[in-house]
Amino acid sequence: MIKIICVGKIKETYFKDALKEYEKRLSKYTKLEIIELPDYSYDEKKEIVEEGKNILNKINEKDFVVTLEINGKNLSSEKLSDFINKNISRNITFVIGGSNGLSSSVLDRSDYRLSFSKLTFPHQLFRVILLEQIYRSFKIINNEAYHK
């Protein structure tokens, strides 16, 4: 099973449509759960702490937690597919923080810190990118045409 915990709601229809498409495609390979948590507009420190508490409340004790962060490890699509294949039995939980990042308590709970790039992406777009890469990983794992 793959779970994605993310702060913030998807607002744009075209992002919602893309996410629905990848959710449909992924249903062939794995159970997928997406948990959207509210983003807060407090001062930055309080916001990170509150979002962190909400994130941790959605993580199960046995989940293999992957935080997505700019200073995490970069993987190729092939290496990400190896990583997912190796850890899928452990219920992989990907965590996308709010605009101010992740709390230290969430980072402490992380089993693996992953970065897709040193670039900064809008959270709505990044969620689509993440689902596409997870889908690509399953295509690679199953030796199916898609990845080049």
Spans of model-derived segments:
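N-terminal beta1-alpha1 ligand-phosphate binding loop
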Residues: M1-L26
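Short histidine/acidic/glycine/proline-rich micro-motifs that form metal-
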Residues: G8-T13, D39-Y42, N71, T120
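Conserved strand-to-helix beginnings and helix N-cap segments that scaffold or border functional pockets
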Residues: F15-L19, K45-V49, S77-S81, L107, ...
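Glycine-rich, phosphate-binding/catalytic loops in enzymes
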Residues: E21-E23, D82-N85, D111-R113
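S-adenosyl-L-methionine/SAH cofactor-binding core of RNA-modifying enzymes
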Residues: T30-K31, E36-T93
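Rossmann-fold NAD(P)-binding glycine/threonine-rich loop
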Residues: G97
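Short, glycine/polar-rich helix-capping loops at beta-to-alpha or helix-loop-helix junctions
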Residues: G101-S105
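Structured adenosyl-cofactor binding patch, chiefly the S-adenosyl-L-methionine
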Residues: V106-K148
